[in-house]
Amino acid sequence: MGFTAQQEALVGSSYETFKKNLPTNSVLFYTVILEIAPTAKDMFSFLKESGPKHSPQLQAHAEKVFALTRDAATQLVAKGEVTLADASLGAVHVQKAVTDPHFVVVKEALLQTVKEAVGADEWSDDLSTAWEGAYDGLATAIKKAMG
């Protein structure tokens, strides 16, 4: 079964909820990444000098990751696959020596952040599955661009 319009709607609405508290949710996202994989700190220029804290770079990067995942949901419904609009994403991930386990860490952090952003009453298996599917589509496209 492919990605559904209902899953796209779930990702879209929860993305809007995530954005309502972007500063806090961005810090949470990177805090979870570093809790799972402390060595990932050196992969992000805005984390090298300190841990996650409110900063324009941190917020911009978190918003980009979540927006790309939301866009992946839209593409999966429309055409069944994700095509990167930014061709440099593959090269950047190669330069940072990103490997499969890093994608797993980011997915876990993304899911924990969405869960926190929407709250326990809105979080569901369907919402988790929708975000997982969208992120997996994005990760597949990035890995393909990495060569």
Swiss-Prot record:
It comes from the Eukaryota. Gene3D superfamilies: Globins (1.10.490.10). It is found in: Cytoplasm, Cytosol; Nucleus. Disruption phenotype: Normal growth and flowering under non-restrictive nutrient conditions, but classic symptoms of extreme nitrogen limitation under restrictive nutrient conditions, including severely stunted growth, increased root/shoot ratio and delayed flowering. Following inoculation with symbiotic rhizobia, accumulation of free oxygen at the expense of reactive oxygen species (ROS, e.g. O2 binds at H61. InterPro entries: Globin, Globin-like_sf, Globin/Proto, Leghaemoglobin-like, Leghaemoglobin_Fe_BS. The modification Nitrated tyrosine is found at Y30, Y135. Keywords: Cytoplasm, Heme, Iron, Metal-binding, Nitration, Nitrogen fixation, Nodulation, Nucleus, Oxygen transport, Phosphoprotein, Transport. SUPFAM superfamilies: Globin-like (SSF46458). Specifically and strongly expressed in root nodules and at low levels in seedlings. The modification Phosphoserine is found at S45. Belongs to the plant globin family. This is Leghemoglobin 3.
